[in-house]
Amino acid sequence: GRMVIRELLSATIEGLGHGEVPVFPIQIFKVKEGVSWSEEDYAAAVKDFDKALAGEIKFKTPNFDLLIEACRTTSVALFPNFMFLDAPFNRHEKWRIDDPDRFRYEVATMGCRTRVFENLHGEKSSWGRGNLSFTSMNLPRLAIEAMREAGDMIPDGNKHAIRKEAREIFLESVRKTATMMAEQLYERYCFQRTALARQFPFMMSNDVWKGGGRLQPNDEVGDVLKHGTLGIGFIGGHNAMVAIYGEGHATSKEAWQTLYDAVTVMNRVVEEYKAKYGLNYSVLATPAEGLSGRFTRMDRKRYGEIPGVTDRDYYVNSFHVDVREPVSIVEKIRLEAPFHAITRGGHITYVELDGEARKNPVAILKIVKVMQDEGIGYGSINHPVDRDPVCGYTGIIGEVCPRCGRREGEGVPLSKLQKLGLYKNYNSTTIGYHGDPAEEA
């Protein structure tokens, strides 16, 4: 297993055919105390990271060296992301370090952030389950409408009074919208149940989906789907807070508390509908890379251009702090961490580095520690990765490529590429003289 992980990380650094950074499939490294993490190992690694990278430090935990390799890989290729199994909501009471099947009790994240773990109909596990569907709430629209309604109720224009009233209207709108979404998800679930097992031959016949192996091809999937999750999602938390308070939840404590309370309201609805229908409802910090732009276009058309709200091409995802806010990486992590505990349907915290991370991989490890300490469930570390399409150089490129000296739009003479070892005249005639291109290259 360790060999496979090492080779996977090595291949990720090498990239695709021409060194391109592979974006998918997403890789996730699990951080777990006693397995791939200890404070003692962290201190030793930070003290002399060059030795840690070279494998010259004997660590206490068996896989801390793989975490070091994962940090090195992230510093070059953006992945892997990091899953923190010691976050209180990610722990499993049956997990034991001496259990060879302990992976069954470890949470797994699908795709960008979807989390499937808690289960009303069986043991808490990610195995044999998935998300059935989710619907996302447009928080900025609810906030804009709340401010308009509050403004009509308080015509004297007292900003404090209007914002206070708008907050209450907004939270009630969140409750009503979440309730409507929960009913919509149930209606869709009832339709999904009528699908036949033969429509999912691989998943059902191989028992990939828990209980599917018991079904005959023409059986409806029915109760087999009850292990899946139904997500009440949301986007645009930052923009919604700007609509009410004139600033985001990174700089306004009142805005932060309002957004936190809004997600708490969603969780109350989730608990209500878990009891009502006996299904695995959850709150999801929606991965809305496409939907956020669509919502913004719709709202700009309806309400016009509102600074900080509808004046960009997209809404900020879920509870994320806007990357343009003047906060440090540590502050961003601390602001977002409490939301992970109340978005059990899935979440992620991104941080952005502005330098060339490959020259400072210890910074990745230090960020991992902050995420571990602050209770992040799932985190990702982004940084600039430029690639020259001609010579293949990967790193930060300014006006001139540091490898071949090319400027944007320019070509590079073949003679220069040959000197750099980046071009060889392989063809049907010359290949016999050079031997195998792969070996020589």
Q: Predicted regions: what is each one?
A:
Residues L230-A243, T264:
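Contiguous, well-ordered alpha-helical segments that form the cores/surfaces of helical PPI scaffolds
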Residues G1-K226, E247, S252-Y426, I431-H434:
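Conserved catalytic cores of very large enzyme subunits
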